[in-house]
């Protein structure tokens, strides 16, 4: 992991098209500003983890009876 120190109004550039700027630092909280192409997905880490967790739950909770019905419809 690369660790960089930045002050307010200083920034970081990633791949020439993603710009991250420190907007403010206040009582243990850092506000960051991001400039990136619209196609670039930017998420807070906890939101990304929640999405992954929900996707895993959704894929794991398949009703076995539904699978059996699908097997009956799709015969080899």
Swiss-Prot record:
Which UniProt keywords are present, listed alphabetically? Bacterial flagellum biogenesis, Cytoplasm, Repressor, RNA-binding, Translation regulation
Question: Which molecular function terms from Gene Ontology are attached?
Answer: mRNA 5'-UTR binding
Highest taxon above the source species: Bacteria
**UniProt entry tagged with the keyword DNA damage:** no
GO cellular component terms, A-Z: cytosol
Any one of the GO BP annotations: regulation of carbohydrate metabolic process
Chief subcellular location: cytoplasm
Which InterPro entries has this protein been placed in?
Answer: CsrA, CsrA_sf
**Which SUPFAM superfamilies does the record match to this protein?**
CsrA-like
State its location(s): Cytoplasm
Asked whether the keyword RNA-binding is assigned, the reply is yes
Q: Which family does it belong to?
A: Belongs to the CsrA/RsmA family.
Q: Which HAMAP family did the record assign?
A: CsrA
General function of this protein? A translational regulator that binds mRNA to regulate translation initiation and/or mRNA stability. Usually binds in the 5'-UTR at or near the Shine-Dalgarno sequence preventing ribosome-binding, thus repressing translation. Its main target seems to be the major flagellin gene, while its function is anatagonized by FliW.
Quaternary structure annotation from Swiss-Prot or TrEMBL: Homodimer; the beta-strands of each monomer intercalate to form a hydrophobic core, while the alpha-helices form wings that extend away from the core.
The molecule here is called Translational regulator CsrA
Record organism: Helicobacter pylori (strain G27)
């Amino acid at each position: 992991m690369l660790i960089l120190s930045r002050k307010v109004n200083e920034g970081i550039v990633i791949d020439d098209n993603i710009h991250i700027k420190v907007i403010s630092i206040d009582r243990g909280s850092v506000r960051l500003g991001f400039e990136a192409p619209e196609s670039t997905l930017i998420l807070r880490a906890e939101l990304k983890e929640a999405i992954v967790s929900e996707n895993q739950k959704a894929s794991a909770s398949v009703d076995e009876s539904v699978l059996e019905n699908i097997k009956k419809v799709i015969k080899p």
